[in-house]
Amino acid sequence: MNRLKSDQKTKLRQFVQWTQVTEAVSLNFLAKANWNIEYAMTLYFDNPNLFAGSTPQPSVDRSNIERLFNQYVDPKDKVGEKRMGPHGINRLLTDLGYEATDRRVLVLAWKFTAQTQCEFSLDEWVKGMTALQADTVQNLRQRIDSINSGLESDKAKFHELYLFAFNYAKSAACRNLDLETAICCWDVLFGQRSTIMTQWIDFLWAQENAAASRLAQNVGASNAKQFKSVWISRDTWNLFWDFILLSKPDLSDYDDEGAWPVLIDQFVDYCRENLNYPKPGNASNDQQMETPSYY
């Protein structure tokens, strides 16, 4: 340890404190993560026995986990026996210091494999807390903060969270995700909007408003408000990840013959016709747009 730099010693102490494993095991994880402590923590919680000879996960007290769960069960929620509902989860988020629109809230639901928005079953809670090796609110926050930070350097894990968000966010009675909820999820997942993300969302609202206007002519404006015209299918949601991740900022490499969802095809056409994006075979090297931070 004497050969380590000052900042490495600090990271080593933090890793040992958070995971309760030995210094030797901690050094292995930190070295594999090139001393990126967030990525090292993600590696550890995904596979604590990654290195031969590593110690098993420190045990957590199930009774403490259940006791903590019961502190957040609120009779006002009326979500059934042994379930934490919206009131309880709001108190939990307050204790964690998270806003409802914080991506860490979605990470929490993902790590607990939650099936219903704003609810945790006792089973989800116990399995999630045990997997995270947390039995206090403080430990839970440390684990979730670390996993969330690690997403920036672990695209595969970020993709898992992205795919989880579709099922978690949509209504159980619907196959697709309504537009407003989808946009909210994209904002939570990706944060500040890039140019292409802003244009995508503007396009979707334009599609929704145009469809609503046509509908209003047939059924009246008041009746038209009851209907949603643009829905995000699972296929569109899943492939939008590839689209936003792989496409050049000016979409000059977009494959018109590729198996893209219709909505994405329409968006590319919209950009070419209305936003001066280069058309196929006429790509421009001069168009300047920022690359999203989540690339």
From Swiss-Prot:
Subcellular location: Nucleus
GO BP annotations listed: astral microtubule organization; establishment of mitotic spindle localization; protein catabolic process; protein neddylation
Stretches assigned to the UBA-like domain: 8-45
Gene3D superfamilies linked: Cullin, PONY binding domain (1.10.238.200), DNA helicase RuvA subunit, C-terminal domain (1.10.8.10), EF-hand (1.10.238.10)
PROSITE patterns: DCUN1
CC annotations in GO: cytoplasm; nucleus; ubiquitin ligase complex
Presence of the UniProt keyword NADP in the record: no
Name of protein: Defective in cullin neddylation protein 1
Function: Required for neddylation of cullin components of SCF-type E3 ubiquitin ligase complexes. Neddylation of cullins play an essential role in the regulation of SCF-type complexes activity. Does not act by preventing deneddylation, but rather facilitates neddylation, possibly by acting with rbx-1 to recruit the Nedd8-charged E2 enzyme to the cullin component of SCF-type complexes.
Source organism of the structure: Caenorhabditis elegans
GO molecular-function terms, A-Z: cullin family protein binding; ubiquitin binding; ubiquitin conjugating enzyme binding; ubiquitin-like protein binding
Domain DCUN1 span(s) in chain numbering: 60-272
Subunit structure: Interacts with the cullin cul-3. Interacts with ubiquitin via its UBA-like domain. Interacts with ned-8/nedd8.
Source domain of life: Eukaryota
UniProt keyword list: Nucleus, Ubl conjugation pathway
Record InterPro entries: DCN-prot (IPR014764), DCN1-like_PONY (IPR042460), PONY_dom (IPR005176), UBA-like_sf (IPR009060)
Main location: nucleus
CDD domains given in the database record: UBA_DCNL
